[in-house]
Design a protein with these regions (language model features):
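C-terminal closing repeat unit and adjoining cap/tail of repeat-based domains
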Residues: 137-180
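Short loop/turn segments immediately following beta-strands, especially the blade-tip
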Residues: 87-100
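Beta-rich, blade/repeat-based domains predominating
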Residues: 7-25, 30, 42, 53-74, ...
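Short, solvent-exposed loop/turn segments at conserved positions within beta-propeller repeat blades
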Residues: 31-41, 80-83, 136-137
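Residue-level marker for isolated small/hydroxyl-bearing positions within beta-strands
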Residues: 28, 78, 134, 175-179
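A short loop-to-beta-strand structural motif that recurs across blades of beta-propeller domains
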Residues: 1, 41-44, 84-86, 140-142
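Short coil turn/linker residues within repeat-based beta-strand modules
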Residues: 49-51, 82, 92, 105, ...
Length: 180
């Protein structure tokens, strides 16, 4: 185990991870759900050699998918419970520029909140900058532009599309996981 805590506070439920070009990583800590309560989550940045971890965003409700824009200037976070996608401008190593309250819930720009009964899960960013988010209940992948517009919804038979990543030599093949 590389990290178990940050500043004396235990990690509760690390979930998704994205590496930057320097080999450092950002990750979501979703927390835990119990019968009558749910933890507030956090976003962390860490060095892959185990020497430094920073809590970057806290509190944030059910942070799940995480990704970086192709130029690594924007950090994307998918909020599961609300089905929202946020973008945070990266201002330095392990730092984001936060939009002040009341203009933002968590400090990020709300990019997409289409509404309806859906939840966002994991995400991957295309080479062109579009954010592809596994979408629960509606069963598909929501393709969202960097400005927040829904470009396309790719429907699958399974209602629980939980993860997506790109692979193959040209990184144009999408691999998804479904869990229903």
């Amino acid at each position: 185990t590389l990290y178990e805590e940050c500043n004396g506070i235990p990690l509760k439920g690390p979930n998704d991870i994205v590496f930057d070009k320097k080999g450092n990583f950002w990750f979501t800590d979703l927390g835990k759900q119990r019968e009558r309560e749910i933890d507030r989550g956090s976003i962390y940045w860490a060095k892959s050699d185990g020497s430094l971890i920073k809590e970057v965003i806290q509190p944030i409700m059910t942070p799940n998918g995480i990704g970086l824009s192709p130029d690594e200037k924007v950090l994307y976070i998918a909020e599961t419970e609300g089905g929202k996608l946020f973008g945070f401008d990266i201002s330095g190593e392990g730092e984001v520029q936060k939009v002040p309250f009341p203009y933002s819930i968590y400090g990020g720009k709300l990019l997409n909140n289409e509404g309806g009964i859906k939840r966002f899960d994991s995400l991957a960013v295309e080479k062109n900058g579009n954010i592809c988010v596994g979408t629960l209940f509606t069963g598909g992948v929501s393709v969202i532009s960097p400005s927040g517009d829904l470009v396309e919804f790719i429907k699958f038979e399974d209602p629980y599309i939980t993860n997506i990543c790109f692979g193959s030599k040209d990184l144009k093949t999408a691999y998804i996981t479904a869990s229903y």
